[in-house]
Amino acid sequence: MSVVFLLQTRPGFERDAQQEARTVALERRGLELKPVETGEGFVLLQSDAPLTPFGWRDLAFSRTLSRVIADIQLGDRDRLTPILDVVGQKAMTFASIWLEWPDTNDGKAMSGFARKFQPLLEEKLATAGRLGQDASTRLQLFFPSKSRVLVSVSEPQWGAPWPLGILRLRMPTDAPSRSTLKLAEAFEVFLGEQGQQDKLKPGMTAVDLGAAPGGWTWQLLRRGIKVYAVDNGPMKGSCDGHPLVKHLRQDGFRFRPPHPVDWLVCDMVERPGRVAELMADWLAEGAARQAVFNLKLPMKKRAEALSDALERIEARMLAAGLAYTLQVKQLYHDREEVTVYLARPAATGRRRR
């Protein structure tokens, strides 16, 4: 029995998402995924085995994933009946219903339609007894256009906990730059609510490499963390002269703190391999316990550049004989880059993405 997977991604990164998913499925489960369709902001892959070879956390370039149960061409008038007919054939109860679309300008125009359509669908399914509080499966309707819907299902371990796989955050009014949203999203995605409470505590220390104007430093300060802000550029706003900030106009690749710190964060514009090696050196040497950093990827061969950078990290940590956690995601607030979380020690040993 073949299964088709829907992977949602940032527009322009579809082939990277496809390449990565096929590689991960083959290396981890011995499953060959066959390309079915590459659209704008999504990819369809087919497997001959009824297994889900990965979850959304295992893939850097895919925001979320689900299993397609129907691909329906819709008419102009009645879009509800064909969907109800398909769902009615499945002996499934759903915890919730999400309407989704590609993260494109045309896709975003679907949001108005979704606001009107979703209550109608929920009412029909609730009346039919297909919605239940004890269910875990989520029904996801992905509209590449108004005339087509991919009906799919997802479990919590497969798909991201946000529609479209997008965690939307509000820009803080007093943050020095919009880059602050990158670190805020990274903490939420990699640590979760409980992890942030446990690992981001007042009184901790951190180093921010490439800190100016202070977007990432601001996220640390709001949690009461002392920051060495390393950058030749000026800090701005509340980060300029803050009592918890020590601004050092030094080379980020040469700086080391006088004592080990709890956190290392870095958003420097540099080759991904060089940044990866620097981050791994810090943790292997014991200069930092955890790190969040961005890898700026080249326009061509992005998946290859990412794989090379991660292999450099793994080689360094292996040479040091250290257990570690390694996770990678292209976050919503990232652009031509991915964000990496690297930590030691890892209670369960190595965890690649």
UniProtKB/Swiss-Prot annotation:
<protein>
    <recommendedName>
        <fullName>Ribosomal RNA large subunit methyltransferase M</fullName>
        <ecNumber>2.1.1.186</ecNumber>
    </recommendedName>
</protein>
<comment type="function">
    <text>Catalyzes the 2'-O-methylation at nucleotide C2498 in 23S rRNA.</text>
</comment>
<feature type="active site" description="Proton acceptor">
    <location>
        <position position="296"/>
    </location>
</feature>
<feature type="binding site">
    <location>
        <position position="231"/>
    </location>
    <ligand>
        <name>S-adenosyl-L-methionine</name>
    </ligand>
</feature>
<feature type="binding site">
    <location>
        <position position="179"/>
    </location>
    <ligand>
        <name>S-adenosyl-L-methionine</name>
    </ligand>
</feature>
<dbReference type="GO" id="GO:0005737">
    <property type="term" value="C:cytoplasm"/>
</dbReference>
<dbReference type="InterPro" id="IPR011224">
    <property type="entry name" value="rRNA_MeTrfase_M"/>
</dbReference>
<keyword id="KW-0808">Transferase</keyword>
<comment type="similarity">
    <text>Belongs to the class I-like SAM-binding methyltransferase superfamily. RNA methyltransferase RlmE family. RlmM subfamily.</text>
</comment>
<keyword id="KW-0698">rRNA processing</keyword>
<keyword id="KW-0489">Methyltransferase</keyword>
<feature type="binding site">
    <location>
        <begin position="212"/>
        <end position="215"/>
    </location>
    <ligand>
        <name>S-adenosyl-L-methionine</name>
    </ligand>
</feature>
<keyword id="KW-0963">Cytoplasm</keyword>
<dbReference type="InterPro" id="IPR002877">
    <property type="entry name" value="RNA_MeTrfase_FtsJ_dom"/>
</dbReference>
<dbReference type="InterPro" id="IPR029063">
    <property type="entry name" value="SAM-dependent_MTases_sf"/>
</dbReference>
<dbReference type="Pfam" id="PF21239">
    <property type="entry name" value="RLMM_N"/>
</dbReference>
<dbReference type="Pfam" id="PF01728">
    <property type="entry name" value="FtsJ"/>
</dbReference>
<feature type="binding site">
    <location>
        <position position="251"/>
    </location>
    <ligand>
        <name>S-adenosyl-L-methionine</name>
    </ligand>
</feature>
<dbReference type="InterPro" id="IPR048646">
    <property type="entry name" value="RlmM_THUMP-like"/>
</dbReference>
<dbReference type="GO" id="GO:0008757">
    <property type="term" value="F:S-adenosylmethionine-dependent methyltransferase activity"/>
</dbReference>
<dbReference type="GO" id="GO:0032259">
    <property type="term" value="P:methylation"/>
</dbReference>
<comment type="subunit">
    <text>Monomer.</text>
</comment>
<dbReference type="GO" id="GO:0006364">
    <property type="term" value="P:rRNA processing"/>
</dbReference>
<feature type="binding site">
    <location>
        <position position="267"/>
    </location>
    <ligand>
        <name>S-adenosyl-L-methionine</name>
    </ligand>
</feature>
<keyword id="KW-0949">S-adenosyl-L-methionine</keyword>
